[in-house]
């Protein structure tokens, strides 16, 4: 299941097209996965209340925001798991940006429900005031990553492009270290620079190809887990 990026800007959220991640979905389908890309509440055609609001810089609550996103991902995964063509213990969550932040919060899920998590540039509050390399309440974000690591049971493959101006490799490594410091398991990888802005790598064919070896490694690691007997 692919969990999309988000924005605090209400107008941009309302105008958001249905997330597709075509190249990423195609790669997953080519490796035997069924793929679901649900649009979460408060975005585009789904509409409704924006439940994962993080608040302003002064009162940013990234932990709460991530957990709400995780709940939304979990609800969609629960629907997917009920389908007859799905291996219920083999679900992989691939998150991007805010969706990846929610996936980190989901790492405390039972591994029998979520087999692996792949997180492209997880975080929230990047590009504060629309300025590159500025993060709203950065210390709060790192502290929330540490909070997610406590009790985490699912391994995370954490990917960030060299030229990501939302969550730079140096800052992302600090978050990954915080996540691991409290017990979380994360394989942190820096991908080569891609295009003008590496944060959107997961949305393009070239970017997905660039991340291909890391993606395949994470998927093979999941596939190596023994299936539950039925």
Task: Name the predicted role of every residue range.
Residues 1-5, 160:
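The conserved beta1-alpha1 loop
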Residues 3-4, 38-40, 120, 191:
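Alpha/beta-hydrolase
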Residues 6-45, 168:
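Short substrate-entry loop that stabilizes the transition state in hydrolases
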Residues 39-58:
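Glycine-rich "HGGG/HGxG" loop immediately N-terminal to the catalytic nucleophile
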Residues 55-84:
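Alpha/beta-hydrolase active-site loop
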Residues 75-140, 147:
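Primarily recognizes the serine-hydrolase "nucleophile elbow" in alpha/beta-hydrolase
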Residues 116, 122-182, 187:
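The feature captures the conserved acid-bearing segment of alpha/beta-hydrolase catalytic domains
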Residues 182-230:
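C-terminal catalytic histidine-bearing segment of alpha/beta-hydrolase fold enzymes
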């Amino acid at each position: 299941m692919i969990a999309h990026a988000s924005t605090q800007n209400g107008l941009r959220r309302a105008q958001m097209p249905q997330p597709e991640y075509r190249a990423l979905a195609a790669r997953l389908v080519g490796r035997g996965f069924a793929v679901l890309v649900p649009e979460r509440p408060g975005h585009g055609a789904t509409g409704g209340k924006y439940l994962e609001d993080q608040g302003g810089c002064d009162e940013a609550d990234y932990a709460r925001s991530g957990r709400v996103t995780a709940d939304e991902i979990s609800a969609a995964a629960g629907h997917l798991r009920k389908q007859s063509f799905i291996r219920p213990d083999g679900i992989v969550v691939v998150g991007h940006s805010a969706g990846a932040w929610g996936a980190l919060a989901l790492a405390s899920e039972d591994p029998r429900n979520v087999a692996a998590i792949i997180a492209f540039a997880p975080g929230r509050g990047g590009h504060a005031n629309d300025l590159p390399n500025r993060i709203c309440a950065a210390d709060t974000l790192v502290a929330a990553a540490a909070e997610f690591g406590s009790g985490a049971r699912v391994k995370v493959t954490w990917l960030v492009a060299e030229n990501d101006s939302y969550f730079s490799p140096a800052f992302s490594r600090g978050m990954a270290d915080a996540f691991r410091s409290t017990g979380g398991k994360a394989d942190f990888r820096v991908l080569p620079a891609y295009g003008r802005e590496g944060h959107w790598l997961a949305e393009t064919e070239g970017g997905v190809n660039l991340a291909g070896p890391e993606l395949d490694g994470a998927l093979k690691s999941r596939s190596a887990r023994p299936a539950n007997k039925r």
